[in-house]
Amino acid sequence: MGVSDKYVRKVKVSCASLRSYTVELRREVIKEAFDKILKKIKILVNIEGVLIRGEYKGSILMLSPKGRIAIIKGPEEEKLKEFLDDLFS
């Protein structure tokens, strides 16, 4: 069990060719998860209470306050777990 298992409820591949994923967080730890993520990403856009767009390890992350994260140009599918574990560590 990795670090990300505490925070991640479900992961879906949005587009395999673009390495895009949708990550759904566990409701009970959304705030804690966002606090960890915000310490690690470079914030590009912050529309207060609507969307945060940031960059992490060459990938674009879009965080919604409802606990969804879109990852664009993310790691290969086999390395996604490692990427998420590092993001939440």
Regions found by a protein language model. Give the residues of each.
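Generic recognition of long tandem-repeat/solenoid scaffolds
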Residues: Y21-R27, V50-E55, I71
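A generic structural signal for well-ordered coil/turn residues at beta-strand boundaries
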Residues: S17-R19, E48, K57, P65
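Short Lys/Arg-enriched alpha/beta "domain-start" segment
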Residues: M1-V45
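Acidic, aromatic-enriched beta-alpha/helix-loop junctions
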Residues: K40-I52, D86
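Short amphipathic beta-strand starts and helix->beta connectors
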Residues: D5-R9, I47-S59
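Short, compact, well-ordered microdomains
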Residues: S59-S89
